[in-house]
């Protein structure tokens, strides 16, 4: 992201929407979070591979609901605290009223979902944990006010071996 490689002609030719995240699996290129997750779920099904979603139909639906909400709402927060605040440098600008309202909404929803001391939303890891933690980390990494239990949840998700391996690879 820092090098803006996702705006290079080669990237744009390979990935239809030229968006990040992007997945290159062999000769198959795909962008957009939801499409990537659905592809991975189909290409690497459980039980041979770790499931991306909870086993229960209601928990799975709740996880997908949360993901859809994260992607479709909170636009002011996403604009004012892009993922660059996590991976590159914090923003020195305070949140606007709209950004603060989105942050407050995120914190309210996350606080209602993350139990005290819980590392996961649904008892065991699922992809919605990673997405929620990444969204919360837009605030945490920037030093914006976030309740301690949510900071702990973000740290627990960020400490996952898969996340650490990806961070080292991208670093």
Task: Describe each model-derived feature in a short phrase.
Residues 1-97:
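GST-like domain detector, emphasizing the conserved glutathione-binding G-site
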Residues 70-159:
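GST-like fold's C-terminal all-alpha helical module
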Residues 169-170:
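Exported/periplasmic ABC-transporter solute-binding proteins
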